[in-house]
Amino acid sequence: MSLSKSTMVLGYWDIRGLAHAIRMLLEFTDTSYEEKRYTCGEAPDYDRSQWLDVKFTLDLDFPNLPYLMDGKNKITQSNAILRYIARKHNMCGETEEEKIRVDIMENQIMDFRMQLIRLCYSPDLEKLKPEYLEQLPGQLKQFSLFLGKFSWFAGEKLTFVDFLTYDVLDQNRMFEPKCLDEFPNLKAFMCRFEALEKIANYMQSDRFLKMPVNNKMAQWGNKRIC
């Protein structure tokens, strides 16, 4: 891989997963980057040797996917990567109120994400799905109330948590297409985000990876088409 010193490298599985918000933020900020995508093998073994063979050779403090390499800076943990990029572009909140809202959303949306991930990777998906869908409106209502009349989740300025939140709400919308219908401000947020020029252009490009959401051992979202 021939890289200039200014080109970041994002490493992750060849899926959407935890890298979707990172990819969108890199695109939105016009960051020069290249991807190293690792492929998981097919059932029943789901061979992960493409990643495991190099996992401990990359000089990462906590070897994991995703990782971001930017010169001497080598970062793991998806939210740490997002914050690293966002700090360069003043997208972590400016006022104390904005920073508090960013901190809350960063963690709340991860909790929400993990609920769907656990469901999608569970062999009991069909058994557990009704319970997930039953509690989904209550969770979405909380996000709707938190957003209120703001344009973005920190207030009137776009921050990195909007990229996270768009991703997780979109996954839930793919899982249950009508789930946002009761929440006009969440639907408006989704449209507003998709209308950002650089995001819209990215979504129309061949770089955009909407599916698969999850890796091959998942029970849902493991294919390249819905």
Question: Residues of each region from the PLM?
Answer:
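Residue-level recognition of oxygen-bearing side chains
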Residues: A80, N185, K198
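Short amphipathic alpha-helical segments embedded in low-complexity Lys/Glu-rich regions
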Residues: G41-A43, C120-S122, N185, D206-M211
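GST-like domain detector, emphasizing the conserved glutathione-binding G-site
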Residues: M1-L140, S144, S151, W220-G221
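GST superfamily/GST-like fold recognition
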Residues: V102, F153-E182, K187-A195, M203
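C-terminal helix/juxtamembrane-tail motif
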Residues: M1-L3, T7, I199-C226
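Hydrophobic/aromatic-lined pockets within catalytic cores
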Residues: A86, N90, M110, G148, ...
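Short, solvent-exposed turn/loop segments enriched in Gly/Ser/Thr/Pro and often Arg
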Residues: W13, F160, D206
